[in-house]
């Protein structure tokens, strides 16, 4: 029976491992959606207010250029992931790339997308520092604990 697989990813090596896992371990009959949630910085980059902190105002152009570069890296990673799945036998028409701006939060947005008829969420374990993970938690941890009525597979 074919499944709908949601691969939550960014441009990290850990995320790409989840794509490799699906390519090796799941039937090519399945439908795969490569899903990414981007932080929506457009409003911040277009902000023209005298109340902006002078330090931020002076760095705004550099910040927005970095955000544009991040968007390019994510797009390239998603295309590379699709190519890997197609080379593993998945039909190109059964591998979709879906990039959305953050709505409620990255983990909550992944869980909201998962409610659209997916059978499993696959994602990489995020390699963040122990201290940062202690205070903020990782996206994969939040998805794992927040998932209801759907399996979550975390690639290491």
Regions found by a protein language model. Name each.
Residues 26-28, 90, 115, 147-148:
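Short conserved AdoMet
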Residues 15-18, 106-107, 136:
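Amphipathic coiled-coil/heptad-repeat helices and related helical stalk/stem segments
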């Amino acid at each position: 029976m074919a499944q709908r697989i949601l691969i939550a990813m960014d441009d990290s090596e850990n995320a790409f491992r989840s794509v490799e896992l699906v390519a090796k371990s799941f039937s090519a009959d399945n439908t795969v959606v490569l899903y990414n949630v981007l932080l929506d910085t457009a409003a911040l980059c277009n902000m023209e207010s005298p109340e902006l902190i002078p330090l931020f105002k002076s760095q705004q152009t550099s910040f927005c250029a970095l955000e544009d570069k991040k968007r390019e890296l994510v797009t390239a990673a998603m295309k590379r992931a699709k190519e890997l799945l197609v080379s593993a036998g998945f039909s190109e028409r059964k591998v979709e790339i879906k990039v959305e701006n953050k709505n409620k939060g990255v983990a909550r947005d992944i869980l909201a997308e998962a409610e659209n008829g997916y059978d499993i969420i696959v994602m990489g374990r995020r390699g963040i520092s122990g201290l940062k993970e202690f205070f903020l938690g990782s996206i994969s941890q939040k998805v794992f604990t927040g998932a209801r009525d759907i399996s979550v597979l975390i690639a290491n």
